[in-house]
Amino acid sequence: MFIALTNDDGIQAPGLRAMYKALKEAGHTVQVVAPVTEQSAVGHAVTIALPLRVKIFAENGFQGMGVYGTPTDCVKLGLNALLDKKPDIVVSGINAGANVGPDILYSGTVSAATEAAHMGYPSLAVSYDNFKPDDIAAHARFAVEIMESMPWQSLPPRCVLNLNLPDVPMQQCKGLTLCPQTRAVWKDWYDHRTDPRGNSYWWLNGIIPPETVAEGTDRDMLTRGYATLTPLRFDFTDRETLARLQQNMDRQRQGSEDL
């Protein structure tokens, strides 16, 4: 298959390089369009007031196009202008750090995959549950196997598959599980610090409290040592509330008509 590969950690990130190598070793054709610089947690940001510039990277058996922009910029520019042809699948990752529950709202990794899905391409986001991945070659090979096993043609339009890999050696991984995303949210705090010049600044920290994580959700299963796969569809409509509001509005209208 022809795979378009991107990420949000940057084109030189170990996770992307591991995924590139695993895809190539599996016999796939791969073209990379990824940010030149770190773009973690930029969400679905798109550059609209600045030009996008491209830098070619070719080193140690790797070749790719680096974009001075966001992950979504990379996908939009790649699919519209840079790639040799339309890819069979767009893969985003491997991200350093899990993307579970509320993470998907912030994640450049998931947003890149989402943009591809919105443009009509099968897409897979891949993340690893450690912010400082070491040797993840086996995890990358596992991700490729999952990609190859998916029934892409039968998935609904604009569906994104979100794969998270546990922070354990792959031989200790308990397997792949399908699960929903957690509804638990981050508890944030900011450290107030002073730089070497005496200037004040703030540094974000946070945690998803374990006691708030429902059993069987992505954060729970990932912590237990499973790889998790969650299909995502970015329709934010709260249909239950929509129905209740509609009923309330209908009652109000009926009451007005009875006067």
From Swiss-Prot:
Alphabetic keyword roster: Cytoplasm, Hydrolase, Metal-binding, Nucleotide-binding
- Gene3D superfamilies (alphabetical): Survival protein SurE-like phosphatase/nucleotidase
The subcellular location is: Cytoplasm
Q: Give one GO term, molecular function aspect.
A: nucleotide binding
Q: What class of enzyme is it?
A: hydrolase
How many cofactor units bind, and how? Binds 1 divalent metal cation per subunit.
The EC number(s) attached to this protein equal 3.1.3.5
Keyword check for Cytoplasm, yes or no: yes
Pfam families from the xrefs? Answer: SurE
Which Gene Ontology cellular component annotation is one that this UniProt entry carries? cytoplasm
Which catalytic reaction applies to this protein? a ribonucleoside 5'-phosphate + H2O = a ribonucleoside + phosphate
Task: Name the InterPro entries for this protein.
Answer: SurE, SurE-like_Pase/nucleotidase, SurE-like_sf
Q: Which residues bind a divalent metal cation?
A: D8, D9, S40, N95
Q: What does this protein do?
A: Nucleotidase that shows phosphatase activity on nucleoside 5'-monophosphates.
Q: Which family does it belong to?
A: Belongs to the SurE nucleotidase family.
Return the protein name. Answer: 5'-nucleotidase SurE
Primary gene name: surE
